[in-house]
Amino acid sequence: MGKNRTIQDIFVVSFGNIVALVANIIIGFILPLILDIENYGYYKTYTLYISYTGLLHFGFVDGILLLFAGKNYDELNREKFRLYTKFFVILESVFGVIGVAGAVAFLNGQMRVIMALVSLNLIWSNLILYFQYISQATSRFKEFAVCKIINAVSTIALVAVLFFIWKKYSNSSLLTAEFYIVASQIISVGLLGWYFVTYRNITFGKKEAFVNEKNTILLILKKGFVLTIAYEVSRLVLVMDRQFVSALFDIETYARYAFAYNILSCVTALITGISTVMFPKLKRMSHDEAMKFFPKGMALITVLVCFAQLGYYPIRHIVMWLLPHYADSLEYFRIVFPVLALTSCITIIVFTFYKILDKNNVFFLVCAVSLVFAFLANVVAYCIWKTPASISWASLISTVFWYLISVLFLSKNYHVQWLKNFAYAMCMVCAFYLTTDFITNEFISIATYLLILIVISVFLYKKDMAEIIKSQKHLSNGEGLRS
């Protein structure tokens, strides 16, 4: 029954992610069409800074996930969780108001507006994250998927309205980054309201006294803080190149650079559902079972991303047809797309294993070292070449370094197998660069990359594929129901 439940959970979350993917595709291509480059650049600056707001939950949501992962929702103490919810609402509201006041008092121009909106967003986004982590911890993946779908459908409707306005009134004052951000935040507030109603049993009503639970709240913060810092440092590694381009180049150059990552996010939206389901499932496994899963999980993610890289070809045509003023973004996209195979392994598989092994402090150190390396690599790239593309290549080098030091600790201490997956990933990275750069005929380029992908995949993962097929036969014959 466990295997079938896991498959169902992955399907439910993946369906929500597919709907989110559709929304990301629409946003990714329509928003830069209806906003001018300057406004799009300001919008992407906003999205860059909201990626840091997770620091301001101070580990509370991660502590909730770590302490309650694997439990059933009915096992949660209602009165205690009502206190946790009230505490977190107050905490985030205080920092949100402080952020808005600071932006108004100390900043000027467009950055004042952007940072004030970032500060407001931290309230909605962190509270939504709190409820999402409760869904994830208690394996209530239906609510998690519904949340994704509501947000995606609402965002699609918003973009559709703006597209209609753009077609009818191309110079409308509504076609600005500020209007879109405010409208998006209204959607977030509505989504938060839905969560309050859905989880009303742990939100409203009689609650435990703070004095009785202050030690538990401190434990939640203590448990989650290191994980949060590790996660945010890892996020800094991921966005280091964008931060450099944002700081060192004009807003239009940054808009084109950020657009490349906007396209990339369409792919990541589809595969992140696996990590959502994985943590509570792995936490229920024995140590040996989890360690055996590691190389298979790494292989699954890498193969999926490598096949997804075939999307580079149609995406290139769509951009050239629909958004020719973003044609420069395609070179950045071509450089960073293969890096996704390595970053996905780190953020989806490796990070999950550090969590279940309770080695968040080690992962923090790994990410801190990687962050320093990434910073130095970007500095060197800019000092020598002074181009956004050189910073993209520096991002590839720093990601390889990050991958190696993060898996070497697991290999040394837990004997996980990783070398085959790394060799596979690097082979496909090289294959992608070679086929997209040196083969001018697109049909031959696609065929060559696909042939290399299939041959290397079968050569390295033939045994793993056979095991997957065998397990599926067992499930279809009913053996999976008895496990």
Language model feature labels by segment:
Residues 3, 7, 124-148, 338-369, ...:
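Membrane-interface junctions at transmembrane-helix termini in multi-pass inner-membrane proteins
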Residues 57-73, 260, 264-288, 295-298, ...:
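Helix-loop junctions and terminal segments of transmembrane helices
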Residues 86-229:
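Hydrophobic transmembrane helix module of multi-pass membrane transport proteins
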